[in-house]
Amino acid sequence: KIYQVGGAVRDEMLGKVSKDLDLLVVGVELNKLAKILKPFGKVNMVGKAFGIIKFKPERSEEDIDISVPRIDSKSTGKGHRDFEVKLGKGITLQQDQLRRDFWMNALAKDVETGEIHDVEGQGKVDIENQQVRVIGPQAFKDDPLRMLRAVQFAARFDFSIEPNTLDQIKKNVRLIKTISADRFQEEFRKMFEKGTPSIGVNYLKETGILRQLFPKSSGNFPIEFDKLDKKAFPAFLAILLKEHSFTDIQKKMRLSNEDARAVSEVMYYMAMTDTGKQEDSEIGLVHFVGQTSAKGISNVEAVLSVTRKTPISNRLKMMKRAGKPTSMKELGIGGRDLVKLGLKGKKIGDALQFSLDHAIESGNNDPKYLLDTVKSKFGVK
């Protein structure tokens, strides 16, 4: 028997389109299944320990996860990456369903008949009641990441977390710190990009997950997360974890270099504007833009949009209309002009920076005026 399992069945019942295709084949050993599939495409046994085959059919660009039923017990190893797994031809569909995290994720659809198999109707009930409910009392001890997944699913589908499940998370919340960092990032990202972030953030606070992972978090946030652009994940993290250092965040999240830099740039901008320093001035703004990545700028712009402050791009346009340079490229003089004055080495860079700041402050970008100012400042005769 072949069944479609996992999120795709849940999403179908929610009326959502899913790109996932996970199949479960009952009544056959894994190795025999691999032999059956081999003539029809590429078989990858990378998930053999978990009873999973990655199968790419001929003329297809996408892999399909095809598995045999299994029974999991608690996760083991560093970061809880490994499970104690039992495979076997005699394991039933229902046994496989009961190993899953939440009832709404334990649905199985008969590929041949279209019939939905739901243990005691629990999954359908939870979807109708719009709630996330854990299957067994050991679920969070077996895999602590499920606590964060419960929050992620609640945010993603605008669901509530069933009261008993919520209590179980609170009782086991300390175990969340045993999970490896890269597994956190995926759940936080889904919570923000695919759901209603405020629901997730409220549950992170209520369950104690936020305090366990980031002890300095006050739980007070200056913006409405739901209004943030969905591409602004670094901005979301920078605001959610604003009391923490960038190093703390990167240690817990293991972000890509690009995202990590953007988080640090948003945090820097927020810190400077909160104290009324540099970035509130035109000079400070130009300095910031000149040192910041494109992704950092777009994430700062996302924050400014939500807080209804003037976008960086608009401020730069106003400066240009006033005849002020917004970068070294727009400065009325260049390095060659300073060499002709007799300046060398570091003094050239210092003089250029001085000229840029002075042109912005004075509103005068005239080359002769700037060269005369440099002569006076740097003692050139």
What residue ranges belong to the model's regions?
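Catalytic cores of the polymerase beta-like nucleotidyltransferase superfamily
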Residues: 1-381
